[in-house]
Swiss-Prot record:
The modification N-acetylserine is found at S2. Keywords: Acetylation, Cytoplasm, Ribonucleoprotein, Ribosomal protein, RNA-binding, rRNA-binding. One of its GO terms (biological process) is translational initiation. It comes from Arabidopsis thaliana (Mouse-ear cress). This is Small ribosomal subunit protein uS13z/uS13y/uS13x.
Length: 152
């Protein structure tokens, strides 16, 4: 990055309802969007033919639109199904990459469904306990500590 930024340099970009830092390199700037990790950001930049050394604020509007179309429709750009974060969706059986607010909604809907059907995972979420088989005898305690009274 040069010491003097040109006039069209954007310090903060608004992409998919998220503020993206324009001073970061494009691959790492995309990771600030929920649902996009480093691996997906890397492959999206390669598919869009964007220079990886460019900063996010240096991108043109056309390049940003190109990146967002690839994120919205990754299967059309030959990104494999195993790369996506929503595989064989419960309702429609489709493969998709869910990002930003849609990711929060899908996660909340999944947890509500698990709670509604009284699934073991759903019940653990409902009770506020650990879900993934961790031990809970000594760790994960909340509330006031109860001391041991001394014998007299």
């Amino acid at each position: 990055m040069s010491l003097v930024a040109n006039e069209e340099f954007q310090h903060i970009l608004r992409v998919l309802n998220t503020n993206v830092d324009g001073k970061q390199k494009i691959m790492f700037a995309l990771t600030s969007i929920k649902g996009i990790g480093r691996r997906l950001a890397n492959i999206v930049c390669k598919k869009a033919d964007v220079d990886m050394n460019k900063r996010a604020g240096e991108l043109s509007a056309a390049e940003i639109d190109n990146l967002m179309t690839i994120v919205a429709n990754p299967r059309q750009f030959k990104i494999p199904d195993w790369f996506l974060n929503r595989q064989k969706d419960y309702k429609d059986g489709k493969y998709s990459q869910v990002v930003s607010n849609a990711l929060d909604m899908k996660l909340r809907d999944d947890l509500e469904r698990l709670k509604k059907i009284r699934n073991h995972r759903g019940l653990r979420h409902y009770w506020g306990l650990r879900v993934r088989g961790q031990h809970t005898k000594t760790t994960g305690r909340r509330g006031k500590t109860v001391g041991v009274s001394k014998k007299r």
